[in-house]
Amino acid sequence: MSDTAQNTEGLITFDDTLDITMAATYFEKLTEMLDQHKSIVLDGDGIERIDGAGLQLLLGFFKAAESLHVTIKWQACSDILKKSAKLSGMTGSLAID
């Protein structure tokens, strides 16, 4: 893998559902991004349903990114995502305003 690929910014756009049924699919996408990029942008604007597994997936992703010195930022977050993160006490850990 070239240095150019390592310095590009990756984008992940979530569909309307981020729950246990989608966790394995997103785990693969997120893991690939960690291997390929130094900066990742997440678009969670379309999320209409998220459960504990979805929040755990995001939390694990943020922790893995931190250990690999990969920067993550949100392009957008849906109200559902914001409320779920707030209720679970994860807004800080998930860098959600």
Q: Predicted regions span which residues?
A:
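STAS-like cytosolic regulatory interaction modules
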Residues: 1-50, 60-97
